[in-house]
């Protein structure tokens, strides 16, 4: 298709090509329109679905067992954009492969998306029989992993494994054709995970591998989901972690730890940074501020042009929620984050220093006025989406907003000690931004420590570098 990049193909269960997905790479909708085409009997193709960024979308996932219906995720929306059934969070639908008629809404969760609306085809975690055809069930991410079963036998196996590993998440990864052997993983907030083989014929579960067996030697903290309300009335979600030795009624130091992205979200599970902080006596708050994925279309749209503003307030409102529960020593609160989380930490340092005792900004973004907003990660194709969400620096009003919410230009406001960290080989944000931020802190004689690793990029990967990173955290705190 001229001007469009093919991003996926769809076959029926007999291997016959049905259609394909494209992403617009030229024209007025460049970078913001996804389209699905169906092959026609005369060897051509016709447009049957079209989706603009942040609009109501529907994405095919698979043919159903009858090889006539298509299972898909999203909103019930026609090719012209008309919404038949507004569900906000995306739902699992069955549609007629010939007419495109929406036949049934199979499952919907009013609080959580079944898959990220940004990821298109094949984004759901669905369990099919070994030859395809039959859908046993699927999982999606709520406060913890949620599972929906359509096959009683598959459900009984999964629930039996869950009973063996209480307080863990069990994920079946693969299985034999006769459904007698299952490869699965087990993990939790205190366990990074292990792989097992379940042989039903022998009634035996055998460990295959383990991520970090030494973790069991340490007392780690429980990570608990919570919900809170933003100051403008939006229901938001997060996770709170209290130290393993926490005593009820005690007010303790806290670290606010926003995730990166911002088009991402936190999940229940093992988080090395969170456990590091908690085992040093800090409470930790992770929050899915507006703009986080997985909570519906409306919440995503509410984040447009709100970097450093309402998105930032959502982080502080999570802190206030924890304070209302009686957990927080408000005189000893720090904020720590990486990538967009590093931006949020530095924004806090320049706009609301009175709330915090210290700042940890790791591989962060500090200048929103740059034409590419994000540096080397995004090609020209990715910019239109960024401009919708954050603003276009070429637009005078947008530029003003981006400038006013760029920490780089407000270093003189900093009052808290800052640990600022970067990798020289970062390909997702500009290394020069960190250099510029450090120069501004130096110009205003601020209290900061600057760490740069020449062989690391957007997040440290080598074991020695990560060990040194945590040592730097501990020394700084």
Give the label of every model feature segment.
Residues 79-82, 216, 253, 385-390, ...:
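Polar/charged alpha-helical tracts
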Residues 214-331, 338-339, 366, 371-377:
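Cap/lid segment of the alpha/beta-hydrolase catalytic domain
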Residues 5, 122, 148, 182, ...:
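A general structural-boundary detector
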Residues 19, 136, 226, 256, ...:
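Hydrophobic/aromatic beta-strand patches that form the interior of the parallel beta-sheet core
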Residues 1-237, 242-250, 263-280, 321-324:
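Peripheral, non-catalytic segments that deliver or gate enzyme domains
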Residues 287-477:
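Active-site-proximal cap/loop segments of hydrolase catalytic domains
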Residues 140, 187, 257-261, 339-342, ...:
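Glycine-rich His-Gly loop
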């Amino acid at each position: 298709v001229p001007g469009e990049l093919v991003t996926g193909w769809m076959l029926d269960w007999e291997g016959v090509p049905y259609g394909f997905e494209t992403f617009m790479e030229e024209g007025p909708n460049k970078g913001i329109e996804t389209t699905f085409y169906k092959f026609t009997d005369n060897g051509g193709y016709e447009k049957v679905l079209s989706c603009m960024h942040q609009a109501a979308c529907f994405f095919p996932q698979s043919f159903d067992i009858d090889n006539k219906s298509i299972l898909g995720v999203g909103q019930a929306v026609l090719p012209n954009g008309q919404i038949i059934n507004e569900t906000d969070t995306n739902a699992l639908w069955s549609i007629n492969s010939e007419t495109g008629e929406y036949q049934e809404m199979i499952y919907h969760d009013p609080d959580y998306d079944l898959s990220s609306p940004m990821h298109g085809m094949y984004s759901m975690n669905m369990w099919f029989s070994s030859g395809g055809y039959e859908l046993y069930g699927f999982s999606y991410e709520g406060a913890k992993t949620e599972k929906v079963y359509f096959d009683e036998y598959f459900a009984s196996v999964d629930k039996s494994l869950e009973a063996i590993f209480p307080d863990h998440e069990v994920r079946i990864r693969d299985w034999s054709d006769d459904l007698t052997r299952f490869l699965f993983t087990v993990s939790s907030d205190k366990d990074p995970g292990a792989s097992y083989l379940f042989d039903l014929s022998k009634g035996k579960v055998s460990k295959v591998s383990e991520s970090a067996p030494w973790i069991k030697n340490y007392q780690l903290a429980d990570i608990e989901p919570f919900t809170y309300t933003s100051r403008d009335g939006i229901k938001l979600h997060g996770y709170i972690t209290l130290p393993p030795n926490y005593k009820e009624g005690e007010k303790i130091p806290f670290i606010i730890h926003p995730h990166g992205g911002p088009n991402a979200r936190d999940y229940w599970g093992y988080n090395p940074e969170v456990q590091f902080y908690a085992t040093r006596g800090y409470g930790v708050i992770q929050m899915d501020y507006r703009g986080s994925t997985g909570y519906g279309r409306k919440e995503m749209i509410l984040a447009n042009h709100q970097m450093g503003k309402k998105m930032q307030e959502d982080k502080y409102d999570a802190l206030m929620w924890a304070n209302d529960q009686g957990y927080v020593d408000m005189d000893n609160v720090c904020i720590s984050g990486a990538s967009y989380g590093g931006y949020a930490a530095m924004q806090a340092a320049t706009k609301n220093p009175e709330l915090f005792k210290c700042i940890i900004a790791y591989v962060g973004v500090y200048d929103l006025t740059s034409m590419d907003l994000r540096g080397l990660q995004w090609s020209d194709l990715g910019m239109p989406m960024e401009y919708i969400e954050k603003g276009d620096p070429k637009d005078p009003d947008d530029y003003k907003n981006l400038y006013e919410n760029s920490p780089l230009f407000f270093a003189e406001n900093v009052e808290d000690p800052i640990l600022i960290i970067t990798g020289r080989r970062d390909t997702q944000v500009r290394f020069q931004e960190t250099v510029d931020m450090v120069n501004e802190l130096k110009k205003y004689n601020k209290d900061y420590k600057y760490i740069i690793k020449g062989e690391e990029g957007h997040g440290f990967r080598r074991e020695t570098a990560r060990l040194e990173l945590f040592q730097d955290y501990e020394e700084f705190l």
